[in-house]
Curated annotation (Swiss-Prot):
One of its GO terms (biological process) is base-excision repair. The keyword Metal-binding applies. Keywords: DNA damage, DNA repair, Endonuclease, Hydrolase, Metal-binding, Nuclease, Zinc. It is an enzyme of class 3 (hydrolase). NCBIfam families: nfo, PRK01060.1-4. SMART domains: AP2Ec (SM00518). Binds 3 Zn(2+) ions. It comes from the Bacteria. This is Probable endonuclease 4.
Amino acid sequence: MKYIGAHVSAAGGLANAPARAAEIGATAFALFTKNQRQWRAAPLTPQVIDDFKIACEKYHFSAAQILPHDSYLINLGHPVSEALEKSRVAFLDEMQRCEQLGLTLLNFHPGSHLMQIAQEDCLARIAESINIALAQTEGVTAVIENTAGQGSNLGFEFEQLAAIIDGVEDKSRVGVCIDTCHAFAAGYDLRTPEACEKTFAGFGKIVGFQYLRGMHLNDAKSAFGSRVDRHHSLGEGNIGHDAFRWIMQDARFDGIPLILETINPDIWAEEIAWLKAQQIAEAVA
């Protein structure tokens, strides 16, 4: 069973997100649980929590179908102690908000060394940041997103994701989210079924499919191996339709949120319908 959706707006209240997802025919969704451009947010009230849970139940979304995303401000590998601590406090708050909402996943970008510390030191800081948050929460898995490798962002190589996981003490509460645009921009080819097989065979060997807890399905405006993060609508970019058809027809991607972050929300319903159709076509065949 594929859970397919998009990163929807929670404007007007978190309880609006499940309704917006249902409107576009989604069976999964992503959201921010707070304003992602601000460090601090007002605590969740019992009313907000209850309304969100009721809406999820109304529209038939379980925690396994929801992939919250943390603030882009957070850098869990920051080279400066004070800034690192600020990010760790904010990340813990994000994890606790998920815990309160009954959500079991939190997707985040791993971090950046800002050209100030060695890559290995940054990866170790990220792992320790995860350990700190896991020790103070229950039931929420920290889901590391691969990056395009733009600037000094780490997480663009499968080996870097594996290194972070290796440093996490509770392996049952760490996972990864593979963004197809980021992977392509980082040099992992997805343009043909054969390329997809090779790329994900490497992922399985280096990271392991047991850690795959979600995906972002995005085509790429950016060129292969460019280390530039530019999303595009499915089939409109440099990856093309084949990769997304291949993912829909591979059971290894069942049971996890498959989230669109493509550039035109007006066609998300069409993109979701197309993805569902690829799955049905495979089942019939």
